[in-house]
Regions:
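Short acidic-aromatic low-complexity motifs
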Residues: 17-24
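Conserved active-site tyrosine of GNAT-family acetyltransferases
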Residues: 25-30, 99
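Conserved short beta-strand elements that form part of the metal-binding/catalytic scaffold
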Residues: 36-76, 122
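Vicinal oxygen chelate
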Residues: 1-9, 14, 38-42, 52, ...
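Flexible, small-/acidic-enriched active-site or ligand-binding loops
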Residues: 82
Length: 122
């Protein structure tokens, strides 16, 4: 087992996902889920855009980094190691009801997690 590191000052800053359609991603994360665009930078020489979105200040809360490679035409493969991004809410049942009304597909209705009691939905 490795030794512990002095993690004073460490924090989870962001997770990055690649998106094929940046505007559609903004629409979903910002308009539907209520996140804010914290910063967006185009890199013409590299032909990509990075956008950071979240619910709070980037310096205080974890956020999502959306990377849009301009030449990407096909959907990305999720791979077999990807799990999910958790967005917590006070009332998962109401959140799923509201999201369904907006056309969001709920793939797993709210209910207790397998082998547990915490209520989750996807």
């Amino acid at each position: 087992m490795s030794k512990e590191v002095n993690n004073d000052g460490y924090r989870l800053a962001h997770t990055m996902i690649r998106v094929r359609d940046l505007e559609a991603s903004f629409n979903f994360y910002c308009k539907t889920l209520g996140m804010k665009i914290l910063r967006k930078t185009d890199y013409p020489d590299g032909k990509f855009t990075n956008a950071f979105i979240g619910y709070g200040l980037e310096t205080e809360s974890p956020c999502l980094e959306l990377t849009h490679n301009w030449d990407q035409k096909e959907n990305y493969d999720k791979g077999n190691g990807w799990g999910h991004i958790c967005i917590e809410t006070r009332d998962v049942y109401k959140a799923c009801e509201d999201l369904s009304k907006l056309g969001v597909k709920i793939t797993r209705p709210p209910g207790p997690m397998k082998h547990g009691t915490r209520v989750i939905a996807f």
